Amino acid sequence: KAISVEKYAKKNKLHFIRFECRGHGKSSGKFEDFTISDWKKDLIDVIDNIAKGPQILVGSSMGGWLMFLAAKARPSKVAGMVGLAAAPDYIDGFYNDLSNKKKEELNKKGFIKYSSYGFSYIVKKKYIIDGRKNKILNKEFKWNKPLILIQGLKDNVVKSYIPEKIVKKVKGNQIQIKLLKNSDHRLSEPFDLKVINECIASAIKKN
């Protein structure tokens, strides 16, 4: 997805920044050593110190949560948002889906080993506690700039009702939901990438 957006930006002579959160992908550090607050700070640092002018933020899954947090922290520097299977406040759902045994282990040891999509990683109790402190859907959020939420109906990670849950809390007059019938959580098929780029173009035109 990021490479597709980068190609789109270059083709249309747009400035483009992409980065992976610490503990993800090729970035330094281990996942278990960071929290939502750490990653929020990283994104805000990029907006404050690297980006020039108002930005269109594109956030996928957890990145969709960070996108909202950054927009709330720096509203004058964010011109619009495009969420790809955006998952704000997913911590509660993650915790509730754990077995009682895993919850017990988390509370006793302070961490658990968790597997998802073939990857195993460590989740610490501080990650859960910090995530709850960074909720955005526990109160109304005013946003009178473009917000487009793209959601695959075959996504088995972020449920299809999540975009509606988001827009009930985000108040504004430029909010859209795009439901893609045959798309999954990755949103990486050619049709998905085309829709993502079209939505970015739409957000730019409204500025």
What is the predicted function of each stretch?
Residues S183-V195:
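Catalytic histidine-centered segment of alpha/beta-hydrolase-like enzymes
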Residues K154-V158, R186:
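Acidic catalytic loop of the alpha/beta-hydrolase fold
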Residues A2, E6-S28:
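Conserved alpha/beta-hydrolase
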Residues S76-V123:
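Hydrolase active-site cap/lid region
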Residues D33-I50:
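Alpha/beta-hydrolase active-site loop
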Residues A2, K145, K159-K168:
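Short alpha-helix in the alpha/beta-hydrolase fold that links the catalytic acid
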